[in-house]
Amino acid sequence: MILQDALRLNIHGAKAAYSLGNFWYANRQYDNAIACWEHSAAINPAYPTVWRNLSLAYYNKRDDKQKALETLEKAYALDEHDSRILMELDQLYKRLGRPHSERLAFLEAHLPEVEQRDDLSIERITLYNQSGRYAEAKELIAARNFHPWEGGEGKITGQYVLCRVELAKIALSEKRYADALVLLDETDAYPFNLGEGKLANAEENDIWYYKGEAFRGLGNEQQAIDCFTKATIGSSEPQQAFFYNDQQPDKIFYQGLAWRALVERIRHAAALTN
């Protein structure tokens, strides 16, 4: 093989060792790949991509999380303008259970790179939502034009809905029923900047339930009943969601809340007629 010959003729050829490692990894010769990359990194430790490749191999093929972390952090330290390595490092932090506050602080220390990528921008928004900072997440979503990618379907629309539902729940707890309804109505259709439309079969038991609560708070009993009825629709069998458009298991919980609300109204109506 040409790369093997090149390395044999020049044992200090860092690029040849790196490229040979790429060949071995692509052909599932993982130990050979790691050996080549380690050799390349020893010769030229200033090349970030070889450290990044070693990190992926350590994590995925040797289950060595500590070495994966050390090498990926080294790769990013060598080139902090590489937004892809930043994304991969944040994903590694996520897998290793790094606290939300630390991940968010890390991303916000590198905002120019975060803003280069939709996936990083969505992670930042997700961290805001997970930290209970829903209004800030809502503002960030409105300020960016997103582009769908394979494997990323439903990510930004999910965060768009989540922050509005959570803000609506806060409004309901404060008896601001009209404000809650405005927020929930914003989930009826998605704005163009999300880059994705709403699926025809979207399961929205939670949204319909909270709309029912808002209408009940406003004294509109019939519309509340209509919303609670819509919130009962869907499968009541718990099942794992494999795809983003599958029914999420928590929707069954809101079906139950909606049925309880309807039963309470039936009992109330029966009590009034007796």
List where the protein language model places each region:
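Conserved structural position within tetratricopeptide repeats
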Residues: D5-R8, E38-A42, E73-A77, A109-P112, ...
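Residue-level detector of the short coil/turn that links helix A to helix B
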Residues: R28, R62-D63, G97-R98, G132, ...
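Single-residue signature of alpha-solenoid repeat helices
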Residues: A33, A68, E102-R103, A137, ...
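Residue-level recognition of tetratricopeptide repeat
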Residues: N22, L56-A57, Q91, T126, ...
